[in-house]
Swiss-Prot record:
Gene Ontology molecular functions: ATP binding; kinase activity; phosphotransferase activity, alcohol group as acceptor
Record-linked Gene3D superfamilies: 3.30.420.40
Keyword Nucleotidyltransferase: no
Organism: Gamma-proteobacterium EBAC31A08
Residues noted as binding ATP in the record, renumbered to the chain: 12-19
Keywords: ATP-binding, Carbohydrate metabolism, Kinase, Nucleotide-binding, Transferase
Pfam families in the cross-refs: AnmK
Domain of life of the organism encoding this protein: Bacteria
InterPro entries, alphabetized: Anhydro_N_Ac-Mur_kinase, ATPase_NBD
Gene Ontology BP term (one): amino sugar metabolic process
Protein name: Anhydro-N-acetylmuramic acid kinase
């Protein structure tokens, strides 16, 4: 009997690639195959404009929603071909969609993702699970982070509490202590502002290994101003997005400084946001496991390590690819949805359970 396979396809706040994980799930979670496909530059620029420009038209929104649906479909079909996994063994594909707006502090909070699941269902022939975040919000959560329960399943170790720190465009972490308890929160900017500065001012996608930042000096005045943001005063659990942490948050005077000093300060901002949250929440005496694209920014990891009182490892040191963790989480959430198993949703007052994700299929 062939293994049942669950696919997770993830594009994060950096909108630079679609990461695709193939999981088999039994007593353990096993990554059968991982594939990553870069966003076409033209589409990445369209998404960037849609996120940053409040005056984008409904026509633009509708068109890009379809384009990303086709990109997800093409990427998933390509990954299946490379994996040599039989399509008949695939139970579902869970897609994150591309987040273009995440606004929680409103009377009617919402999180908006694009990437039409109807197209993905039609083009792949698979059952699609999507739109996880809005049921999370409906149940009293913030729609992010979604991954704490998966982190618990993957990284739990008896008598050894862990912080699972995901550094994407936005940083979030899960506190893994008890098998049946979850705790997680967004903590602030990860790569979002760093990458935006590199793209807009240096015409490079990112500062590889943090090499430019490592040569600079911290502007403590700007850093102090950034750390006064009201987001950091909110109680956890909380969520945020590029609506808040983007290039516009930086002062005009600061943007006139040398590139290495700007990037050095932004690394410090990301690192301090993370460490301040860990300390504030009393999670000091446990290991930190880092995953996400920011794990490859050596200077950022170095600064986190120097500020922390915790031992630090990369998820890859534990056998889990730093780039694969989030798409693995979506595959696992897809598995839970098609199995009609509720997920734990963390709210400001208590944890509740609910079915996350909408199911779309193009045939019986």
């Amino acid at each position: 009997m062939s293994k049942k396979i669950y696919i997770g396809a993830m594009t994060g706040t950096s909108h630079d690639a679609i990461d695709i994980s193939f999981l088999s799930i039994g007593t353990k979670i096993h990554l059968e195959y991982f594939h990553s496909i870069k966003f076409p530059k033209s589409l990445r620029l369209k998404v960037k404009k849609l996120i940053e420009n409040n005056e984008s038209s409904l026509s633009d929104l509708g068109t890009i929603n379809k384009e990303i649906g086709f990109l997800f479909s093409k990427s998933i079909n390509e990954a299946i071909g490379f994996s040599k996994i039989k399509k008949s063994s695939i139970e579902c594909v869970a897609i994150s969609g591309q987040t273009i707006r995440h606004e929680i502090n409103k009377r009617f909070p919402f999180s908006m993702q694009i990437g039409d699941p109807n197209i993905v269902a039609k083009e792949t022939g698979l059952l699609v699970v999507s739109d996880f975040r809005n049921m999370h919000i409906a149940l009293g959560g913030e729609g992010a982070p979604l991954v704490p329960e998966f982190h618990n399943q993957l990284f739990y170790k008896a008598r050894n509490p862990r912080i699972i720190l995901n550094i994407g465009g936005i940083s979030n972490y899960s506190f893994v202590k008890n098998r049946n308890d979850i705790w997680g929160t967004d903590v602030g900017p990860g790569n979002a502002i760093l990458d935006a500065y590199c793209s807009d001012f240096l015409q490079i996608p990112f500062d590889k290994n943090g090499a430019i930042a490592a040569k600079g000096k911290v502007d403590h005045i700007e850093l102090g101003r950034l750390l006064q943001n009201n987001f950091f005063k909110r109680k956890c659990p909380k969520s945020t997005g590029k609506e808040l942490f983007n290039i516009k948050i930086l002062s005009k005077k600061f943007l006139k400084k040398k590139a290495e000093d700007i990037l050095c300060t932004l690394v410090e901002f990301s690192a301090k946001s993370i460490i301040n949250s860990i300390h504030k929440n009393g999670h000091n005496n446990c290991d930190i496991v880092i995953c996400g694209g920011g794990a490859h920014n050596k200077y950022l990891v170095k600064r986190i390590s120097e500020m922390a009182s915790n031992d630090i490892v990369l998820s890859s040191d534990l056998g889990h690819d730093v780039f694969a963790i989030e798409s693995m989480a979506f595959a696992w959430m897809g598995y839970k949805r098609v199995s009609n198993e509720a997920l734990i949703v963390q709210t400001s007052s208590k944890n509740v359970k609910g079915l996350l994700g909408s199911i779309t299929k193009s045939k019986l």
